[in-house]
Each structure stands twice: as structure tokens, then as C-alpha cells.
Amino acid sequence: EAVVYFAMDVSSSMGERDRQLAKTFFFWVVQGLRRQYLHIEPVFVAHTIEAWEFPESEFFQVTGSGGTVASTAFQKVLEISTQRFDPSRFNSYVFYASDGANFQNDRDAAAAALAEIGKFANYVGYVETAAEQQQPPLGTETAMLFEQLEAETGLAGRYALTTPESVWDAIRAFFARPMEEAA
């Protein structure tokens, strides 16, 4: 059995374009997983300075305001994992979408929570919504946290979502490797 956590930043810095890119990525990932696997438990988390779990029908409609504290999303994933999806019984996959903004004083807490996720997750993916002209892509603090996890575990990846077309490139990049290994 597998659980797939979809966590999304819905803070003020995530504009409509950013949210649409993230939601499109998540929507197609969910559809693809449902076609490929019989037993997938999707979990949907959205956050600003706090994090909440949502039913799928509400997750794709959620918007928020305020600042960004990424560690709250990671802590919510850890909480749900502990309460409902024992990592010894479930393969766990985590996908996080953000524009990369995060309160500076949250860096250590976000790094610690992400490291805890890295201890049990089969794979952790990060998509960063970015403008096409943003240089360098994936140059944010949040992207660097995922780069560090990727270097430490080899079971993480990052991808910049810049256009609707890049959603498919991200899906191919993430699923070429982890899903083959999990099968």
C-alpha cells in the first residue's frame, strides 16, 4: 500500500498563476497514480503560517493569505504519518509545491522536519513555481532544503514549473525513477 502526500503553499506570495501550476501538477499526478495503482491513499495539505489537511474536493479550490512557514506543512505530514500511515506498512511519497518563499526564521525548523520525512519517505519531490526568466531556477532557500535532502538520501528531486507545459516535464522527471523502483 502507498500513501502520497500533496502539500501546497497557498500563502499570499503564491499568485494565481503559481497556484494554478501547482494544482495542475497535483491533479495530473493524482490521476496518473489512480490509473496505475489499486491502493493509493492521497493526503492533501495546504499551508500558510499554519497547515491544514483538506479533502481532495476542497484542496483543489483552496486559497490563502498571509505569510509562509513551510515547516508547518512538513510537520502536518509527519503528524498524519504517525497517526494514520505507519511507514513500516505504507510506502510514502511526498510532493510539495511552493514559490520558494519562506520566513527566514523557519529555515531550521523546515530543514529538521524535512529531514524527518526523509527518514521514512520512499521519495520526496518539490516543484517550485517560477517565472520563466527567473535566474537561477530553483535558487530559493526552500529549493536548497530539497537539494540537501536529495544529496543526503538520493530519494528526492526538484523541478521548476514555469509554464503549463512544464507540468508534464516535471511529472516525467519525477516518475521515471521513483515509481519504477517502487513497483
Name each model feature, range by range.
Residues E1-A183:
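Acidic, glycine-rich A-domain
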